[in-house]
């Protein structure tokens, strides 16, 4: 009796399967084989289409994910060169089929924007001076693409997977030429506005000035940042010496500071309000996320951990509240897989990258008139600096520009 039941069940199963195959004989190949499981397929970010964006200049898209596997500008633990691979691997449960962001009410992979994975910049680990040139040239190349939304005359936007934090400098250099001076929201446990002379070494060279802790100081001195619309958020690092001298130096670079502990007093809402109060609605914004902004319990796989950080849940909520900003570029950096045995750091990195892409998509295409206006203001400020012999913008410079009638006209 049991044998007869087994045979009957097998026949029914065969009949059902045969019927399904017959009903789908006319299915095309994409319908049959176009969807991957999280564990199948080539590991692009979120199973996005892969395009060699540095080579194929004819390809049009709106948002690109680009890896920059560079980590030879670190001051402590390395390993972030393997970050892009790890973040892509951790993103494999993201797909366009199952990509709806319940926090934002959109699926960024099925909306107006064409989102692709551009692969990696093959940056040298042998020579930091050459690496900086390579990364800058790569970003300039990427920004010479046309976006699929061709009516706005602006290039695609990019989310970068690092790599150590120094990779923000070549990105800002390239973006400055396209968008003008940028307001930077810098999620990090460290200031990263240290002058190279702050590092404890008698030995210095031009190459040694370029580090993952000095790049925002360099960016300021090169006129890449807005004067007073930049934010550090999540700070909790120890400072130099026996005073707030590092904060005094940071003031001169044009940053406002939000310390990690502030979230305990005013909650997430107060953090968001403080960020938004410093970022005008008419400037292009770059968001940089150093994974060490998170507490080591949530992100142990990084080079310079600091205890007492935010949780992933809190950072995601803060990013979600910034979706109305004019986000023209972003990065997630300092993910170091050798120190991430359970992969929770790379998983956090993949989620943060997803949230940043969501922000770009939900905001929609950037208004080209806004960018034109910002470029004009930025160029006039730079010209004023050069005429007056200033190497970087300060309040003193702005006062003097007005007195000399180098007034920035709208």
From Swiss-Prot:
One of its GO terms (biological process) is putrescine biosynthetic process from arginine, via agmatine. Mn(2+) 1 binds at residues 165, 188, 192, 290. It comes from Kluyveromyces lactis (strain ATCC 8585 / CBS 2359 / DSM 70799 / NBRC 1267 / NRRL Y-1140 / WM37) (Yeast). It holds the Pfam family Arginase. Catalyzes the hydrolysis of 4-guanidinobutanoate to gamma-aminobutyrate (GABA) and urea. Involved in an alternative, arginase-independent arginine degradation pathway via GABA. This is Guanidinobutyrase. Binds 2 manganese ions per subunit. Its cofactor is Mn(2+). Keywords: Arginine metabolism, Hydrolase, Manganese, Metal-binding. Belongs to the arginase family. Agmatinase subfamily. InterPro entries: Ureohydrolase (IPR006035), Ureohydrolase_dom_sf (IPR023696), Ureohydrolase_Mn_BS (IPR020855).
